[in-house]
């Protein structure tokens, strides 16, 4: 198994792009695709690893046969602990090891292509601006997203961000918008802290809002998500009366 094929990023920006692609794939495995990931991690099979690829795909497979491998290898045997602990704890454990692997791969490229102190520091800062996979899986990133977000929970503010769609009834599928100045003053110091922390973050990937992206809000946990992260298109969203994110859907299914 080659963890990424022949693609070799050579600049800080390319390594970071590689990191983000692998990270996005592993987050999908542990969140939106968690049922398939759980099924593939059969404890009866040999040592299995979770791989993230630069194209945002993920894969459960055996480790590389060549020694030493072309790239650092992820942790072995994630399937063995699947049935021996609570699912949430198991996913968190895989997430922690996945974070360690992503850093190992990124700084492997940095060492291989001679990044100097400034390059390594810049790469680390770029990586550190994103929530870890563990934070996303454990829900910490969602909490941070709520703290950082200045999105209002009432329909009037949602309708502002959906004005281009021409209907308040579709406001929950809009792009997140900051609150009005008057609302910020009413909420005092707490709101000021939120402003300092930044914009709305996607509850799945943890990345901040950017222009020309479709977002959707979960009606249960009231978190915002990239449509692409939860596999919802604008056309599909028009026919959803109450949207539930994958995390909320899984909780209701297990209860």
Curated annotation (Swiss-Prot):
Gene3D superfamilies: Zinc/RING finger domain, C3HC4 (zinc finger). Ubiquitously expressed. Residues 145-200 are annotated as: Disordered. It is found in: Nucleus. Keywords: Acetylation, Chromatin regulator, Metal-binding, Nucleus, Transcription, Transcription regulation, Zinc, Zinc-finger. It comes from the Eukaryota. GO terms for molecular function: methylated histone binding; transcription cis-regulatory region binding; zinc ion binding. PROSITE patterns: ZF_PHD_1 (PS01359), ZF_PHD_2 (PS50016). Residues 165-178 have a biased composition (Basic and acidic residues). Its main location: nucleus. GO terms for biological process: chromatin organization; regulation of DNA-templated transcription. The modification N-acetylmethionine is found at residue 1. The keyword rRNA processing does not apply. GO terms for cellular component: nucleus. Residues 179-198 have a biased composition (Acidic residues). Residues 150-160 have a biased composition (Low complexity). A zinc finger (PHD-type) spans 199-251. The record marks 209, 215, 219, 224 as: Histone H3K4me3 binding. Interacts with H3K4me3 and to a lesser extent with H3K4me2. Histone-binding component that specifically recognizes H3 tails trimethylated on 'Lys-4' (H3K4me3), which mark transcription start sites of virtually all active genes. The PHD-type zinc finger mediates the binding to H3K4me3. Belongs to the Alfin family. PANTHER family: CPG BINDING PROTEIN (PTHR12321), PHD FINGER PROTEIN ALFIN-LIKE 4 (PTHR12321:SF182). This is PHD finger protein ALFIN-LIKE 4. It comes from Arabidopsis thaliana (Mouse-ear cress). The lineage of its organism: Eukaryota, Viridiplantae, Streptophyta, Embryophyta, Tracheophyta.
């Amino acid at each position: 198994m080659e963890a990424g094929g022949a693609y070799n990023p050579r600049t800080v920006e390319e390594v970071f792009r590689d990191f983000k692609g692998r990270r996005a794939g592993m987050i999908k495995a542990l969140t939106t695709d968690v049922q398939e990931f759980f099924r593939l991690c059969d404890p009866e099979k040999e040592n299995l690893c979770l791989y993230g690829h630069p194209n945002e795909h993920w894969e459960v497979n055996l480790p590389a046969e060549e020694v030493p491998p072309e790239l650092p290898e992820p942790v072995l045997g994630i399937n063995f602990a699947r049935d021996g602990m609570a699912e949430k704890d198991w996913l968190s454990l895989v997430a922690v090891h996945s974070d360690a692997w992503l850093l190992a791969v990124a700084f492997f490229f940095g060492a291989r292509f001679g990044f100097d102190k400034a390059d390594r520091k810049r790469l680390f800062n770029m990586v550190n601006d994103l929530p870890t996979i563990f934070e996303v899986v454990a829900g910490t990133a969602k909490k941070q997203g709520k703290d950082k977000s200045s999105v209002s929970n009432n329909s009037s503010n949602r309708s502002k961000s959906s004005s281009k769609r021409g209907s308040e009834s579709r406001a929950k599928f809009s792009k997140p918008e900051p609150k009005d100045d008057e609302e910020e003053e009413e909420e005092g110091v707490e709101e000021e802290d939120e402003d300092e922390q930044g914009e709305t973050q996607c509850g799945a990937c943890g990345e901040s809002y950017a222009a020309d992206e479709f977002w959707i809000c979960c009606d249960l946990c009231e978190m915002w998500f990239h449509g692409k992260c939860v596999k919802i298109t604008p056309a599909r969203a028009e026919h959803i009366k109450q949207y539930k994110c994958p995390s909320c859907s899984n909780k209701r299914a297990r209860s």
